């Protein structure tokens, strides 16, 4: 397998964009397609390419962004007065079309006990209209598969689905391994262009009875062996990421061959 070089840009570029269209991809996923004058030059690398998303506050007429040089954007961002500081969140590129200068962003739609959509970014996505402003700060990729990897194991909850779908499309044709993908409902399944040698397991979470990430972790723990020359990518709810890494390491996969990232943390209890 060709080496995928882990890349965080030294001088990340900020791209201003506007909404082109939106659509509900599945019951739990809202897609927002955006474009912008410079977006045709977005340095897309495939795999789990991610970015910082900046959204203007509801009362603002214009989107205010931090002014920075190099990669030091965080302090300039915090220096913006709180009532003018844009909302910032991390997202993966769901798809990118360079010729059209269009980029797709998938937002997980989670509803609280009242039935209302929760989360500032998800609320924005569900109400987004053509012309709405936003900005993307390129952050590169995390997927870091060694050139000699014998197999690939990818595990995620729904927050990692945009990344895993893109990873499946980006993997070389001869890749072998497995994907364990947790989703809230059976209707959230989607077509994945995975290599023929990658076994795809959809794990549907039991509505209202299971902590997000727990079902994927249970499925991963059914794995009783891991090739020490393989590679793993585990993302999603924090406990899924950390406990998934721990299990794979116990099976013999070296820590340096495991990429893990907690995209979020469940507020009530651990997924273990």
Residue ranges and their predicted role:
Residues 1-272:
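Extended, composition-driven regions rather than compact fold-specific motifs
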């Amino acid at each position: 397998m060709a080496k995928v070089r882990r890349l965080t840009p030294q001088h990340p570029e900020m791209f201003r964009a506007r909404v082109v269209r939106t659509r509900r991809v599945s019951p739990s996923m809202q897609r927002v397609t955006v474009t912008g004058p410079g977006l045709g030059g977005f340095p897309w690398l495939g795999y789990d390419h991610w970015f910082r998303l900046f959204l203007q506050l509801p009362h603002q007429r214009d989107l205010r962004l931090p002014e920075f040089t190099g990669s030091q954007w965080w302090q300039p961002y915090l220096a913006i007065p709180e009532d003018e500081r844009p909302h910032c969140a991390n997202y993966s590129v769901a798809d990118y079309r360079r010729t059209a200068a269009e980029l797709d962003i998938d937002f997980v739609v989670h509803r609280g006990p009242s039935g209302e959509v929760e989360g500032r970014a998800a609320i924005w996505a569900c109400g987004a209209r053509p012309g709405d402003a936003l900005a993307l700060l390129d952050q590169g990729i995390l997927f870091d598969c060694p050139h000699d990897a014998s197999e690939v194991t990818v595990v995620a909850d729904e927050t990692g689905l945009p990344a895993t779908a893109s990873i499946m499309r980006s993997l070389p044709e001869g890749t072998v391994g497995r994907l364990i993908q947790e989703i809230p409902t059976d209707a959230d399944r989607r077509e994945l262009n995975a290599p023929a040698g990658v076994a795809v397991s959809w794990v549907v979470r039991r509505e209202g009875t299971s902590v997000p990430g727990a079902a994927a972790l249970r499925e991963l723990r059914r794995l009783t062996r891991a090739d020490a020359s393989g590679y793993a990518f585990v993302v999603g709810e924090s406990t899924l990421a950390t406990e998934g890494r721990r299990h794979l390491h116990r099976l013999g996969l070296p820590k340096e061959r495991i990429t893990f990232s907690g995209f979020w943390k469940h507020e009530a209890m651990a997924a273990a």
